[in-house]
From Swiss-Prot:
Function: Catalyzes the reversible cleavage of pseudouridine 5'-phosphate (PsiMP) to ribose 5-phosphate and uracil. Functions biologically in the cleavage direction, as part of a pseudouridine degradation pathway.
Cofactor-binding details, from the entry: Binds 1 Mn(2+) ion per subunit.
Name of the protein in question: Pseudouridine-5'-phosphate glycosidase
UniProt-listed Enzyme Commission number(s): 4.2.1.70
Binding site for Mn(2+): D139
Family affiliation: Belongs to the pseudouridine-5'-phosphate glycosidase family.
Iron-sulfur as UniProt keyword: no
Gene giving rise to this polypeptide: psuG
Organism, scientific name: Roseobacter denitrificans (strain ATCC 33942 / OCh 114)
Length: 310
């Protein structure tokens, strides 16, 4: 641990020293989610939303072999403009660091980094999951196994709608991951506020979610929680409208032989084209919405710990 090339930004280091709430943020949305300069603008906006609520943002990335917990302004800008950045999960983060590489962290790698840094809450857009056709391709995101073993509460707008949501929920149940939807009974569908799937659990406020996180820690249970936060109805694309668009994108990916890590970026880009940019607008709205909730959960965790005298 002493030799680990890990560095906190000045802002994150100060927040840790003062016991202030911190929320981890992933970096693949910057490098693989949207073009420059929009990616930089959105990253700054999400960070500023957290700061406005009294929470410190910790955007996580690997740069020149060092794992950064929080990026300085110039580092964020450099990452936003970088080309050919690796997309890191549990499988390849160590190799990237060992070879002095640069990479953006997915959900699984961000969870690992957050836990190493003592950060309990992480906000993202949507988690990865079981891809459609996984019964033959075995394409299942490492995010699901990470949720089962790393004790970080992840706030997302559900699983990405391009996935097989039913199978994703089944795997999460098998792995013992609590799936908590906020404020409604149905599991959200990323760009759409609701889906046909009932959420395993429901909670209506960040205080309860924070208490559940702490209870898992106290019980000695491994793994984190998935907090499914529906996109606001004013920002959503209804599921009935999206279904045929997703089907078209899936068919195009199959026709062009897109496989592995290339599948998700291809589908997101194709859906962006087919929705004439509305999917990206919704994505930005849901990421900001998730960050705000994550901030409230982080604040509740700190408050609960103070009350308990921990």
């Amino acid at each position: 641990m002493t030799n680990l090339p890990l560095r906190h930004s000045a802002e994150v280091a100060a927040a840790k020293a003062a016991g202030r709430p911190i929320v981890a943020l992933e970096s693949t949305i910057i490098t693989h989610g949207m073009p420059y300069p929009q990616n930089l603008e959105v990253a700054r906006q999400v960070e500023d939303d957290l700061r406005a609520a009294g929470v410190t943002p910790a955007t996580i990335a690997v740069m020149d072999g060092t794992l950064h917990i929080g990026l300085e302004a110039h580092q964020l800008e450099a990452l936003a403009q970088a080309k050919g950045v690796a997309k890191l999960s549990r499988a390849d983060i160590a190799a990237c660091m060992a070879t002095g590489g640069t990479g953006a962290t997915t959900v699984s790698a961000t969870m690992i980094a957050a836990h190493l840094a003592g950060i309990s809450v992480f906000a993202t857009g949507g988690i990865g999951g079981v891809h459609r056709g996984a019964e033959s391709s075995f394409d299942v995101s490492a995010d699901l196994l990470e949720l089962a073993q790393t004790p970080v509460t992840v706030v997302a707008a559900g699983a990405k709608a391009i996935l097989d949501v039913a199978k994703t929920l089944e795997v999460l149940e098998t792995q013992g991951v609590p799936v908590i939807t906020v404020g409604q009974d149905s599991f959200p569908a990323f760009w759409s506020a609701e889906s046909v799937f009932k959420s395993p659990l429901r909670m209506d406020d960040p205080v309860g979610i924070a208490a559940a996180h702490q209870m898992r820690v106290d019980l000695g249970l491994p793994g984190g929680q998935l907090v499914a936060n529906p996109i606001p109805h004013t920002d959503e694309i209804p599921a009935t409208e999206l279904a045929p668009i997703i089907a078209t994108a899936q068919a195009d990916a199959e026709k062009h032989g897109i496989k592995g890590k290339a599948v998700t970026p291809y589908l997101l880009q194709r859906i962006y084209e087919l929705t004439q940019g509305r999917s990206l607008t919704a994505n930005i709205a849901l990421v900001r919405n998730n960050a705000r909730l994550a901030g409230a959960i982080a604040q509740a965790l700190i408050a609960n710990a103070r009350i308990a005298g921990k």
